[in-house]
């Protein structure tokens, strides 16, 4: 048996700590979604990165096992790829900043529909999603439109972003000054290098407009959106497409910052 540490949705003031220990028959990768017993019910949880816990098998001695008194993981949602380490680090930062438990933040930023599903239900959703994608066929790869020539300011900004280490940069300008074109060029660079691109929208009403502009600029690229106006099923489908690497472009409001992107 192996010990794993699981983040569950418990308040920071509950006294339970950031993670709870459970036992599993097989080692579980960090970021794996599970269901674990908590009190009288099974709740969703996430196996949390902990190098020492992952390396420590429970003693085979029955007396030692009894001393640990760990409950077993109820179910492993093995159909879903584990959440990436970068996502876990982002959640840990948010938990520290807002003084919340890791599980409280981690579970709250997952799609509500995902938290309700067991592994069989999740696998079924993913099969249906794959069938719909196969039935629709590949997106017609039309030639992308010719981008407008860059202004001197845009050229300077892009050159600075390409040469600098990853950091926060502020683009300031009135409407129509060319900020969106900079975002489009940065997204193009990410897509060309085989990465996914996440574009955050300041308010939900701007999502359709920006989505149409990105779709026109990148024909043949799969684009999904994430915001609170989507139905629970739509939000889960788009989240899965992003997490599984199927969606290349993700547009969304601030909730999309917690969307895991493998590339």
Task: Put a short name on every predicted segment.
Residues 1-263:
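Accessory, non-ATPase domains that flank or precede helicase/AAA+ motor cores in DNA-metabolism machines
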């Amino acid at each position: 048996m192996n010990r794993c540490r699981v983040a569950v949705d418990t308040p920071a003031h509950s006294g339970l700590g950031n993670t709870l220990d459970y036992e599993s028959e097989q080692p579980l990768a960090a970021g794996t979604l599970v269901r674990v017993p908590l009190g009288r019910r099974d709740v969703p949880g996430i196996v949390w990165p902990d190098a020492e816990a992952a390396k420590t098998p429970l003693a085979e001695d029955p007396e030692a096992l009894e001393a640990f008194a760990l409950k077993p993981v109820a179910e492993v949602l093995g159909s879903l790829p584990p959440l990436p380490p970068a996502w876990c680090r982002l959640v840990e930062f948010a938990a520290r900043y807002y003084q919340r438990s890791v599980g409280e933040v981690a579970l709250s930023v997952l799609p509500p529909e995902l938290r309700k599903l067991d592994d069989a239900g999740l696998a079924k959703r993913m099969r249906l999603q794959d069938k719909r994608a196969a039935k629709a066929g590949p997106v017609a790869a039309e030639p992308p439109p010719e981008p407008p020539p860059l202004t001197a300011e845009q050229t300077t900004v892009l050159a600075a972003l390409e040469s600098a280490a990853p950091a926060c940069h502020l683009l300031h300008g009135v409407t129509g000054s060319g900020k969106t074109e900079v975002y489009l060029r940065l997204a193009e660079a990410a897509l060309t290098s085989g990465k996914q691109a996440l574009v955050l929208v300041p308010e939900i009403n701007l999502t359709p407009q920006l989505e149409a502009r990105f779709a026109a600029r990148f024909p043949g690229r799969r684009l999904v959106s994430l915001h609170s106006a989507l139905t629970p099923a739509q939000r889960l489908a788009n989240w899965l497409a992003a997490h599984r690497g199927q969606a290349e472009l993700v547009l969304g409001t601030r909730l999309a910052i917690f969307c895991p992107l493998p590339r």
